[in-house]
């Protein structure tokens, strides 16, 4: 999915407002995903999935760091996320549908924390951005 200049601007501005809360938001989105889509828990059998778990917080930070990297390299996400794509496709073998589920939970989390900033245009831009990230992460499944 091609991001327009306006989309890129919206994504960078929205992610900039996340600031130091990125890891917390990542963990919150994971918790939402585990509660809303229980089948996603199967990829984390070794995790304590309870609220506030250090493992969920740690993985939430990894998710947030990957998204921060994608925002910083929005014009070259395939190269920026190549190692992560390899990991999810070849080692972890995560079903691609799970990226869509996590993307949805991230959008809900961002909207809950920044309702005034979560305009329809920003929502659409973030949705396109997360779809692009998902496409990159699943590109090596083929």
Swiss-Prot record:
Residues carrying N6-succinyllysine: 8, 12, 17, 41
Tissue specificity note: Red blood cells.
Keywords in alphabetical order: Acetylation, Heme, Iron, Metal-binding, Oxygen transport, Phosphoprotein, Transport
Keyword Glycoprotein among UniProt keywords: no
Phosphoserine carried by residues: 4, 36, 50, 103, 125, 132, 139
Modified residues annotated as Phosphotyrosine in this record: 25
Modification Phosphothreonine, positions: 109, 135, 138
Metal-binding is among the record's keywords: yes
Positions annotated to bind heme b: 88
Residues with the N6-acetyllysine modification: 17
Cellular component aspect of the GO annotation: blood microparticle; haptoglobin-hemoglobin complex; hemoglobin complex
GO molecular function, one term: organic acid binding
Domain of life: Eukaryota
Every Globin domain range: 2-142
Record-listed O2 binding positions: 59
Pfam families xref list: Globin
Oligomer and partners: Heterotetramer of two alpha chains and two beta chains.
Record function comment: Involved in oxygen transport from the lung to the various peripheral tissues.
Homology family: Belongs to the globin family.
Protein name: Hemoglobin subunit alpha
